[in-house]
């Protein structure tokens, strides 16, 4: 009789991580949180679509490739990067970590025959993947709707001009932002009973990025993401300028940051004890 090969080591950990991720991914795409997240991310798409339904002559005259590129850069940096990505990753990640402790279901995972770091990695992949899917879809739709003002020239701008490259840059920054913020909120959800307070402090920190000295900008997720943008919006007179890192440094830095924060989250999970009598 042929014996079935039982996976072990990295193969077993990979299978367990993907199994947890698939299970948690279903949770991300249901519930009332998804409605608010979807409305938040689709708000720019709806606003831009309304400009086509109720067109203004001034906007039609303003609709050149350069002007629209600058307009989208401002919208992406001020709303999508600072609000859409941040709150989407926060809502989905906190739901998968801290909410399960409040609902008294987290202990099922902690008692399972799997490393706690595997559980953290699977939940993180689900939250980051769902966040990236929602936010990247909003970025793609808003980009196409805005540049539809170019009319027949849109195809040339996308295929022969910088349009497609710019779109890929925005999508890449969005995906990296979802990874970074999902890792941070995974750690917050394991460290504190109320990660919303720490999330609010993080949001405040990212909001005053332009006022921070160059040394403190290095510990901001937003600083590395802004370095990946094809267009960087102008900052106000009170801003403290800092040389943005190269794109390769930003990507590698964000990936390293995510790995370090996830390692801390796994370390915290291994020492975590669930006490429902005090929650």
Regions found by a protein language model. Give the residues of each.
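Membrane-helix interface segments
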Residues: 32-34, 115-117, 121, 162-163, ...
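Helix-loop-helix units of permease transmembrane domains in multi-pass membrane transporters
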Residues: 95-129, 277
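Transmembrane helix segments
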Residues: 47-58, 192-234
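Aromatic- and glycine-rich beta-strand/loop motifs that create alpha-glucan
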Residues: 2-38
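Secretory targeting signals
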Residues: 8-10, 45-95, 120-191, 231-236, ...
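Junction motif at the cytosolic side of a transmembrane helix
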Residues: 187, 256-279
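Hydrophobic core positions of alpha-helical segments in small-molecule transporters
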Residues: 37-40, 121-122, 134, 198-201
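Membrane-interacting alpha-helical segments
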Residues: 14, 18, 22-29, 165, ...
């Amino acid at each position: 009789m042929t014996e079935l090969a039982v996976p072990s080591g990295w193969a077993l950990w990979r299978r367990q991580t993907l199994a947890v991720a698939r299970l948690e991914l279903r949770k991300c795409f249901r519930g009332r949180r998804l409605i608010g997240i979807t409305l938040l991310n689709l708000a720019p798409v709806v606003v831009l679509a309304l400009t086509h339904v109720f067109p203004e002559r001034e906007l039609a005259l303003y609709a050149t490739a350069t002007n629209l590129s600058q307009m989208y850069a401002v919208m992406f940096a001020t709303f999508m990067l600072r609000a859409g990505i941040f709150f989407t990753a926060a809502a989905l990640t906190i739901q998968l970590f801290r909410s399960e402790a409040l609902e008294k279901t987290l202990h099922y995972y902690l008692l399972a025959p799997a490393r706690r770091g595997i559980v953290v990695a699977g939940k993180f992949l689900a939250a980051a993947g769902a966040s990236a899917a929602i936010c990247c879809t909003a970025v793609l739709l808003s980009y196409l709707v805005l540049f539809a003002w170019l009319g027949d020239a849109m195809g040339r701008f996308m295929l022969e001009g910088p349009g497609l490259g710019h779109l890929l840059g925005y999508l890449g920054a969005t995906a990296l932002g979802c990874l970074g913020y999902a890792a941070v909120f995974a750690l917050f959800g394991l460290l504190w009973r109320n990660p919303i307070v720490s999330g609010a402090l993080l949001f405040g920190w990212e909001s005053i990025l332009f006022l921070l000295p160059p040394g403190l900008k290095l510990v901001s997720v937003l600083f590395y993401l802004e370095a990946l943008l094809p267009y960087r919006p102008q900052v106000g007179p009170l801003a403290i300028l800092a040389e943005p890192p190269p794109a390769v440094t930003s990507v590698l830095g964000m990936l390293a940051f995510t790995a370090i924060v996830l390692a801390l989250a796994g370390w915290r999970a291994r020492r975590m004890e669930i006490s429902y009598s005090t929650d």
